[in-house]
Amino acid sequence: TFYLGEFFGWNFAYQMIGIIVIFLCFIFLILIKEPTREIRPPKDFFKEPLGWFEDSFLAPLKDLYLRYKNHLLLLLLLIFTYRLSDMFLGPMAMPFYRETGFTKIEVAEITNFYGLIMTILGGLFAGASVYRFGLSKNLVAGAILTPLTNLPFIYLNMIGHDVNFLILTITLDNFTQGFVNVMGVTILGTIVSKSFTATQFAFLVALVSVPPRIVSGGSGIIVDNMGFHEFFIICALLGIPAIIFSIMAHKRRQELGFE
């Protein structure tokens, strides 16, 4: 996108990206076959509205509650806060790069292309680490790494335009993002029941999407009133609740199935 924006303008860049995404989605829809599975006929909404509502919504939530009971609040708080620090920083990353003096080409090459590679490597490392050390320890590690890897942005803001330090910052931040993304998906995959996978997964993903909706609007306000230095400090501090909840989950890993 940044390469196209640099040479052809943003209007052309976004049009081309939209066309490419639609084309790829169309190809995948054609090529990927749905898995064969036994489908239980759902209750008719018009004939049995209460039964339909119970099967579609109440039963999955009831199952989630009955399986975790006293630990459900901890799980929801962990899901809600686990990536809060990165979600708060995300909307202001691009304005920060531009204000610091990085060109579109530098942003494209370092934060997008190289950053994507580091995100993939972080995800692969997370999968191997979960296999070797288990889920709960890696949850704690991811919660600690997230605010720590936000701190280099503070120094980058102090020194200004420095390509080498931007590469180091993106290396640490995107690798951790890939690691934490896998942890987040693993949490959801561990919590959901096979009988209600779709509904429970949709509910939990919706819960995960709440933090960015709440906090992203405040990012720009804080930057305007306090500056990027204080903003990045706040981003790091927002990672503290996730550390606390992940440690609590680690202590209850047997009950939660996070071993």
Please place each PLM-identified region on the residue numbering.
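A late C-terminal transmembrane helix in Major Facilitator Superfamily
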Residues: 195-225
